[in-house]
UniProtKB/Swiss-Prot annotation:
GO molecular function: L-lactate dehydrogenase activity; L-malate dehydrogenase (NAD+) activity
Family: Belongs to the LDH/MDH superfamily. MDH type 3 family.
UniProt protein name: Malate dehydrogenase
Organism: Hydrogenobaculum sp. (strain Y04AAS1)
Catalytic activity, as annotated: (S)-malate + NAD(+) = oxaloacetate + NADH + H(+)
Active site: H190 (proton acceptor)
Key words, A-Z: NAD, Oxidoreductase, Tricarboxylic acid cycle
Top-level taxon: Bacteria
TM stretches of this protein: none
Length: 332
C-alpha cells in the first residue's frame, strides 16, 4: 500500500465526528481529530480522545487498518503541534448563533476562531490543503484565505457538494431512479439564495425538463434551497450526516488526486471572475479538485433566469464579505 495522506479535523462536534467516522470506514487516510475539552459541571473531559479511541476500536472490529488519534486544544492555540505533517486540514470548529446575537456578532466571533486556527495552520501545516466547513461558509472560507495569505487554490469551502446532493436526492425521489444517474449542480452562496441549475440537470444524459414538468421542477428547486431548514425543523438541529459525507467526497478527491468536478466555495481567478461576474469573494462554483487543491474552475452554462438568480446570490455574499473584511483587518 502507498503512503497514506494525513487529514486533520479541527472540531469534533457532530459534523467533525462524522467526517472522522466515515474516513475511518474507508481506511484510505490517517486521521487526527482536535477539539476543546468538554465541560460537565466542574469537570473537564478530553472527549476528543475518547471519540478517537472509540473509532479506532470500531475499525478493529470491522477489520479496517487505520490510524486515528485525538488531541485536546485550547482557545489560545495550544495543543496544535500534531497538525505538523498534515496534508489536508478540515475546519468545522465554530460558535453557534445564540438568541439575541446578531449575524455581525456571530461573524466576529467565528472569524476570531478562524484566526486562532489559521495561525496554527501557518505554524505547523503551511503547505496543507484547507477545507472550511464552518458557517457562514462562503464568508469563513474568504476569511481563512485572507488570514493564511496563501495561494487561493489551497482554501476550499464545503457548500455546493452538499446542496447538489440534496438537489440530486429530490430529483431521484421524484423520478424513482438511482441518484447515481442524476447529475445536477447547485452554485452560488450557501444559503437561501443558492442557485440550483435545473437547466443543466439530467438523468442519464436526459435533461430533467423532458422528464419533470416545469411546476414540479420549481418545487424541487425551492425544496433544495431550504433543504437545510427542513432538516432543522424535523430534528431541532442542523444536519450532519450529509455534510460530513460531502466533506469526505472533497477529501478523497484531494487525497487520492481523483480530479473530481465538485461545487465548492472558492476565490475565483481572473478568467472565472469575468465569466461569473464576481470578484474578490468566495462563492460556490464547479471546480476540479486534485492533490494541489483547485486545479480548474469550470464555467457552467446558465439560463437568463439562472444568471439573474446567480447575480442576486453574488450580491448577498459580497455584502457579507464587506462586513467580514472589517473583522479580518484586525488580524492582518
Amino acid at each position: 500500500m502507498g503512503h497514506k495522506k494525513t487529514v486533520s479535523i479541527i472540531g469534533a462536534g457532530n459534523v467533525g465526528e462524522h467526517i472522522a467516522s466515515l474516513l475511518v470506514l474507508k481506511g484510505a487516510v490517517n486521521i487526527r481529530l482536535f477539539d476543546l475539552p468538554k465541560k460537565d459541571g466542574e469537570k473537564l473531559y478530553a472527549h476528543v480522545k475518547g471519540k478517537a479511541l472509540d473509532m479506532l476500536q470500531m475499525a478493529c472490529a470491522l477489520g479496517i487498518d487505520t490510524d486515528i488519534s485525538g488531541f485536546v486544544v485550547d482557545q489560545n492555540g495550544n495543543g496544535y503541534e500534531a497538525l505538523e505533517g498534515s496534508d489536508i486540514v478540515v475546519i468545522t470548529a465554530g460558535f453557534p448563533r445564540k438568541p439575541g446575537m446578531s449575524r455581525d456578532d456571530l461573524l466576529g466571533i467565528n472569524i476570531s476562531i478562524m484566526n486562532t486556527i489559521s495561525e496554527q495552520i501557518k505554524k505547523y501545516a503551511k503547505n496543507s490543503i484547507v477545507i472550511v466547513v464552518t458557517n457562514p461558509v462562503d464568508i469563513m472560507t474568504y476569511a481563512v484565505y485572507k488570514l493564511l495569505g496563501c495561494n487561493r487554490k489551497r482554501v476550499i469551502g464545503m457548500a455546493g457538494v452538499l446542496d447538489s446532493s440534496r438537489f440530486r436526492t429530490f430529483i431521484s425521489l421524484e423520478l424513482n431512479v438511482s441518484p447515481k444517474d442524476v447529475h445536477a449542480y447547485v452554485i452560488g452562496g450557501h444559503g437561501d439564495e443558492m442557485v440550483p441549475l435545473a437547466g443543466v440537470s439530467n438523468v442519464g444524459g436526459i435533461p430533467i425538463s423532458t422528464l419533470i414538468d416545469e411546476k414540479k421542477i420549481k418545487e424541487l428547486v425551492e425544496r433544495t434551497r431550504f433543504g437545510g431548514g427542513e432538516i432543522v425543523d424535523y430534528m431541532g438541529t442542523s444536519a450532519y450526516h450529509a455534510p460530513a459525507a460531502s466533506v469526505v467526497e472533497m477529501i478523497e478527491s484531494v487525497a487520492l488526486n481523483a480530479k473530481r468536478v465538485l461545487t465548492c466555495s472558492v476565490l475565483l481567478d481572473e478568467e472565472a471572475s469575468k465569466y461569473y461576474e464576481a470578484e474578490n469573494l468566495c462563492v460556490g462554483v464547479p471546480v476540479k479538485l486534485g492533490e494541489n487543491g483547485v486545479e480548474k474552475i469550470v464555467k457552467v452554462p446558465m439560463t437568463d433566469f439562472e444568471r439573474d438568480l446567480w447575480m442576486k446570490s453574488v450580491a448577498s455574499v459580497k455584502k457579507n464579505i464587506a462586513i467580514a473584511d472589517e473583522f479580518v483587518s484586525k488580524y492582518i
